A protein has these predicted regions:
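Coil-to-alpha-helix initiation sites in intrinsically disordered, low-complexity, charged segments
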Residues: 16, 26-27, 85, 104-108, ...
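Juxtamembrane/transmembrane-helix boundary motifs in multi-pass membrane proteins
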Residues: 22-26, 30, 116-121, 125, ...
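Membrane-interface coil-to-helix junctions
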Residues: 39-136, 164-179
Length: 203
């Protein structure tokens, strides 16, 4: 009896996973539409030139963005220190962390690892900004489609999430704080956990 119940549970869980994959696959086209619309909106707001890694003039403003970019430049041209992320060329002899320049530390460390492949002038803040916008739209769509079957409503709702003032104003002033898609990713993870937390149980 227990074995029969176990097999039935496995079949149910497998069916749920298959249905989830099918649902996500059917929505891929809409994710692409959302990404394209957001790309256009991003270009209208900030211009497409900021996406050029070789174009740095826009980052050399009086805003905090200059601090972010200067932190990356200093970190890139400095020797490695431990813990990873330390630099002292901007406050010698004191060491500070790249975290405090808000230079998107994960990207700063990654690009420093491949510094020899990069041109002399290189900025990643524009591309990161676009990535934040697109991920904001996609993760909000993934959450919204749990509450409505209307794909139009999902698309419109995701655009509203993307155009919230806190997102737009923070993007190139406190760029790290524009990573609001991480909040949506956290919510989506909670939803997935609640939906599939029993999928590996044997009873």
């Amino acid at each position: 009896m227990a074995k029969k119940k176990k097999n039935k549970s496995k079949k149910t869980n497998k069916k749920e996973k298959v249905e989830y994959i099918k649902e996500e696959s059917s929505f891929i086209g809409y994710y692409i539409i959302i990404a394209v619309i957001i790309f256009i909106i991003f270009g209208l707001i900030y211009g497409l030139r900021v996406l050029n890694p070789l174009y740095e003039d826009w980052a050399l403003t009086k805003s905090d963005l200059m601090q972010h970019y200067s932190g990356w430049k200093a970190f890139r041209n400095e020797s490695w220190h431990f813990p990873i992320g330390l630099l002292n060329s901007v406050s010698y002899p004191t060491y500070i962390s790249i975290i405090y320049t808000d230079s998107i530390p994960l990207l700063a460390v990654f690009f420093k690892l491949i510094w020899f492949l990069l041109p002399k002038t290189f900025q990643y803040f524009g591309l990161y900004g676009l990535t934040c916008y697109i991920l904001q739209g996609i993760f909000s769509a993934k959450i919204l489609k749990k509450y409505t079957d209307s794909k139009i409503n999902v698309i419109v709702g995701s655009l509203i999430f993307t155009l919230i003032p806190s997102m737009m104003f923070r993007m190139f002033y406190h760029t790290a704080l524009a990573s609001q898609w991480l909040i949506l990713l956290s919510l989506e993870t909670i939803y997935l956990y609640n939906d599939y937390k029993d999928s590996n149980k044997i009873y």
